[in-house]
Structure formats: C-alpha cells, structure tokens
Amino acid sequence: MAKPAKRIKSAAAAYVPQNRDAVITDIKRIGDLQREASRLETEMNDAIAEITEKFAARIAPIKTDIETLSKGVQGWCEANRDELTNGGKVKTANLVTGDVSWRVRPPSVSIRGMDAVMETLERLGLQRFIRTKQEINKEAILLEPKAVAGVAGITVKSGIEDFSIIPFEQEAGI
C-alpha cells in the first residue's frame, strides 16, 4: 500500500504587484524589456548577416567546383553504366571512395492553372479526378450554437476574455 504524502507541495505564487504605482512601474519595465529584446534580436540578425556574407564568397567557388566535378562523374558513369551495373542487374556501384546510383523517381503530377484544369475535367466528364473536401462549417455553428448543443465533440466557447499589456511606445516617424 502506498504511503500518504507527508508534505503537499504547491506551486510558488506568481509575482503580483501590490498597488497602482507598482503596476505602472511594472508596465514600464515590460516595455523596457521588450525594447531590449528587440535590440538584441536586431544585433543578433546583424551578426548572422555579417557571418553569412563573410562565408558566402568563400562557399560559392566551392559549390561551383562540386557542380563541375559532379557533372563530370555523372557523364563518365553514364558512359560506363552497363559495366558499373552489371548489365542493369544492380542500381548502385561502389567506386571505393563512394557510391553512384541510379533511381527512377515515382510518377508525379504537376498542375498549372488549377481553375482552368478543373473546368476542363468537369466539361470532359472526368469528375473522378476532382476531389471534393468536406469540412465542418464553424461559422454556421457560431450563428446557431443551440442547434448543435447536444452533439458530442462540438464545444462552442464564448465570453472568453484576453488580457493584454501594451506599454506606450513613441514612434520616431522615420
């Protein structure tokens, strides 16, 4: 049998200012902290941009070399594919320093001009290629919440109040 708890721990109480002046001071402090966080984020983004710019120039020629070498390797492998794949029996060849492989991608569909394609499919009687999505109309439920009151899985929430703190900020007009 489990022992009953000797001591019940409760969460520490959150900080609550005790008067109007403390609230005013705390709102000012929130604004100060938000501005400081914004300054630090800007400084961080500036540093990231500097690092990116510094390394981008060094990375670009390396990427070009990789692309050139890759095209050359692919060209040689295509010319010698029959030998590398044992007459098409395997799809991968081990070349000591790495593997080369050939894979056929699965079929895919791309559609340009969705509305025009839909109209054409309907006109040609090819509705089987058109998917109709059913979904619950939440806007209608909000207009008639009593009609769905007994339906399991539907909860209409109303009267929820959000509290927000908006410290005053002065715009520089820049």
Swiss-Prot record:
Domain of life from the UniProt record: Viruses
UniProt keyword annotations, A-Z: Coiled coil, DNA end degradation evasion by virus, DNA-binding, Early protein, Host cytoplasm, Host-virus interaction, Inhibition of host innate immune response by virus, Viral immunoevasion
Protein name, UniProt field: Putative DNA ends protecting protein gam
Keyword DNA-binding: yes
Single GO cellular component term: host cell cytoplasm
Record note on quaternary structure: Homodimer.
Induction behaviour: Expressed in the early phase of the viral replicative cycle. Expression of early genes is repressed by viral Repc (latency) and favored by viral Ner protein.
A family per Pfam: Phage_Mu_Gam
Coiled coil stretches, renumbered: 26-56
Localization in the cell: Host cytoplasm
